[in-house]
């Protein structure tokens, strides 16, 4: 059996410079600067295009002090992909920088692990340190997209 071949593209839409103490829980606040880039991914072949993660929006990026180089849908357009026509989107996890532009994909079926949705709608979100990386509206939108009619 021959498996289909796919092309994989990383589309950078933002970046930041911080320290480990700012980026990771329990990081050393005395660390040197640490650069971090933000990407959405495209996996495609002649029959199918899948987007992996959808990035954050400009307003959320500004609220968190992140750069916003381009809207992820503009990055997709550079590959002649219309976000509005994508049928499958995989969300690896619900952090704001992975699940913030769900509305850009009105035709998509969203794929996310049950355990991730259980986590972001469970008791762990009562702890500020754990919920810091999530946006409540993104979580609510994902619940509607996955479980709604």
Kindly give the residue locations of the regions a language model identified.
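Short amphipathic alpha-helices and their capping/turn segments at secondary-structure boundaries
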Residues: 1-2, 39-45, 100-103
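Structural signal for conserved beta-strand scaffold positions within catalytic alpha/beta enzyme cores
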Residues: 10-12, 112
């Amino acid at each position: 059996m021959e498996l289909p071949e796919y092309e994989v593209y990383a589309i950078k839409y933002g970046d930041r410079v911080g320290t480990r103490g700012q980026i990771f829980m329990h990081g050393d606040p005395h660390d040197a600067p640490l650069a971090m880039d933000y990407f959405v991914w495209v996996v495609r072949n002649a029959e199918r295009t899948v987007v992996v993660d959808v990035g954050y929006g400009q307003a959320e990026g500004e609220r968190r002090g992140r750069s916003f180089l381009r809207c992820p849908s503009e990055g997709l357009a550079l590959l002649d992909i219309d976000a509005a026509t994508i049928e499958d989107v995989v969300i690896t996890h619900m952090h704001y920088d992975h699940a913030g532009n769900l509305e850009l994909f009105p035709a998509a079926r969203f794929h996310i692990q049950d355990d991730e949705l259980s986590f972001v709608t469970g008791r762990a979100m009562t702890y500020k340190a754990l919920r810091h990386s999530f946006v409540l509206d993104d979580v609510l939108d994902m619940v509607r997209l996955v479980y709604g009619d």
